Regions:
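Structured, hydrophobic secondary-structure cores that serve as assembly/anchoring elements
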Residues: 1-245
Length: 245
């Protein structure tokens, strides 16, 4: 996930609002990126502790890492518990109305609240603008999908020298089903029952005879990150049925 800093010229909400369409990120690039506004103020140790303005990417990465370790990659790194530790202030203190102008554009705002201090107050990807209506609108949904893609791919590399038939497919369903069920029990997916939270499909429908001839096994995994039974689909492909030499 790419954390994008606001441009130096974005000194006002209006500048950010007018500049957002010019970021020139589309498709998967935008799905894998998130932008945060405004810049932050911190003490600069190289200037004797003088407070200076810095880009927020470092502290945002820290918030993400803290959220991952405490709650899981599926938890949004935003809200009152997503505090900006060590941040002395923000370049701009925003109102709810100003936040309401930027959030629908996919710009995540950093806010200051009484008692709670400075926090991350948005969790959208750069495909998160309301007008885009993208299934990867939210940072935790996209990061969970990336986590699943990598984990499931690595977890099925053993199939390469196995016969590409129903016993293999059944073992894949069993292994990946156990992995997904463990995440379900941790609260990664929506739904009170496993069937509403995730599914794993690997059979003669996903892997045709032509796929078998080509030495390919296809796996389809769905997970419900926002609402029960509303699945985001991940498709995996591995080599199988190869002859060890």
């Amino acid at each position: 996930m790419l954390i994008v800093d606001p441009k130096a010229a974005w000194a006002t909400v209006g500048a950010a609002q007018s500049g957002a369409p010019g970021m020139n990120l589309n498709g998967d690039m935008a799905r894998n990126a998130a932008i945060y506004f405004p810049r932050i103020k911190q003490a600069d140790s190289q200037l004797g502790g003088q407070v200076e303005t810095f880009v927020p990417c470092g502290v945002i990465a820290g918030v993400m890492a803290r959220t991952d370790s405490q709650r899981g990659v599926w938890k949004a790194p935003a809200g009152l518990d997503a505090s900006l530790s060590g941040v002395a202030g923000l370049q701009l203190d925003m109102t709810d109305a100003e936040n309401g102008l930027l959030n629908p554009l996919g710009i995540n705002c950093l806010r200051t609240f009484p008692v709670h201090g400075r926090v991350v107050w948005g969790s959208r990807t750069m495909r998160g603008a309301d007008a885009a209506a993208d299934e990867y609108k939210y940072v935790p949904v996209r990061r969970l999908a990336l986590f699943l893609e990598e984990s499931l791919y690595r977890g099925t590399q053993w199939v390469v020298f196995e016969p590409n038939d129903e016993p293999l497919w059944a073992q894949i369903r069993l292994n990946l089903g156990a992995f997904m069920h463990n995440l379900f029990r941790q609260g990664a997916f929506q739904g009170t029952a496993p069937r509403d939270a995730y599914f794993v499909k690997c059979d003669k429908e996903t892997t045709t005879q032509n796929d078998i001839n080509l030495g390919i096994v296809n796996i389809v995994v769905g997970f419900a990150p926002l609402k029960p039974a509303e699945f985001v689909i991940i498709k995996l492909q591995q080599m199988a049925g190869q002859i060890a030499t």
